[in-house]
Amino acid sequence: MTTDTPVPTWTWPEERLQTIMNRARAGRSFKPSAWENGAKCAVGLSFDSDHDTFELRDGGKSISALSQGQFGPRQGIPRIRELLRNNSIPATFFVPAVSAIHYPDEQRALIDEGHEIALHGWIHERNTLLDGDTERDLQHRSADALETITGIRPVGIRTPSWDFSDNTLQITAEMGLLYDSSLMADVDCYELLLNGEPTGVTELPVEWIRDDAAYLVMDRWGGLRPQIAPHDILQIFIREFDAAYEEGGIFQLTMHPDIIGHRSRIWILKELIGHIRQHKDIWFATHADIARYSKLNG
């Protein structure tokens, strides 16, 4: 007689623990002693342009949920572009292929304004639910789609929902991508190891603390309700930046056009940029430029 009861983790042998822990792990730090043009701190602003795909990825067809995603390209992106343009700040937009295909002019306009377009899955799928061949196919197709639309081959990836499978790092390394921005082992860039071996892929780490969705997502049917006022979120982001500045490191921020792009919320980013601009020795850069500089100078 067989049973599907999982083996208790406290009975796992050390070899199994090491295999799991070392599949994708942080290697050596790539923190440079100084940044481009002698800047003390690098600032990388990023936006995940999920748009309609957040509803579509699991087969959802809710017109209400789709309309919420469509707020991103209709209202959020224009507000973000204007704010970045007024402050001469380059940023990185992680774009699911389906979003890029349905909003191609948006991607071309962002490229024309000096921003980076990077990988964010095909339809914001969860990688841990895919077999390796499917994940590999979708990642290659996504890169091809973004290149066709923008004319530039993406060099970086952020996995949808930061969902990182056992196959993700190997596929990313096989594709020769410069960086990933989905993991959280540090505040500075570091090299990613696959089964203990260097991959050549640089990690530009993220954190839920520095993600607008962690504070502002509303789930109509679930228990998620925004409980933090915009002013308080701003103070968290300012404290994160101030610490990064004192350490001479990176201030990385993850945002979403359909979240931060609302009128009462874009204020957070506007005020944050104003605070950062009070410091003269700042390098605003795309994630690709930060990862590349860190790898060469760290």
Task: Give the location of each predicted region.
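A short glycine-/small-residue-rich loop at the edge of a beta-strand within enzyme catalytic domains
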Residues: 224, 228, 232
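Glycine-rich, positively charged active-site loop/lid region within alpha/beta enzyme cores that binds
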Residues: 203-224
